[in-house]
Amino acid sequence: MNWKFSVAVCLTLGWQSVFGLEIIEVTVDVEDGRYRVFGQSRIEATPEFVYAVLMDYDNFHKLAGGIAESKFLPNDESGNMMAYTRFESCVLFFCKTLEKVERVVGQPTNSIQVEAIPDLSDFAFNESSWKIERSAGKTLLTFEAEFDPDFWVPPLIGTWAIRNKLLNSAESIGMRIEWMQAKGLTLAQVSE
């Protein structure tokens, strides 16, 4: 069955938090079981600070709800950085714990590329990227991901849930980063 469901949130007036966070766009598309997500926001923090926070896998679980555990693993045989993430999430009556082992490649202050290892993850395919750009004295943060879950996702509820989770995560991550930058804290110094 081939179906596509797309949700776009483009807030033309520019939704803003009390911190200055602006959520620009959030979209979720699914076709033939493969999800594509896109999120973009503008954050009142330097690109260097945003990059450092996003690369702190040992403390990444402190950024947003649903991430139960995150940590760096030993590098793989080629010397690539490896990380582990465990997510716990419920949508209505459907609850799932997901694990992901991934290769992490960072280009300091510019971008982070992440690729899950299917044999060690609950995803048949999962690639994501963070693009970090200076923009009008703030940081433009763009998140893109494409994934094939290795488990059943309720069709209409799943897309809605992923979109809501992405929007809530963008807000939570952005506000936490802005707060830490304003207070001069690293992610390691923040309590859970």
Stretch-by-stretch model annotation:
Residues 1-7:
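Bacterial N-terminal signal peptides that target proteins for export
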Residues 38-41, 70-72, 98-105, 127-134:
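Hydrophobic/aromatic beta-strand elements that line small-molecule binding cavities or substrate pockets
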Residues 43-47, 87-91, 106-108, 120-122, ...:
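Beta-strand elements of well-folded, non-transmembrane domains
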Residues 50-51, 60, 104, 141-143:
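Hydrophobic pocket/interface hotspot
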Residues 117-168:
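Beta-strand/loop substructures that line and gate deep hydrophobic ligand-binding cavities in soluble
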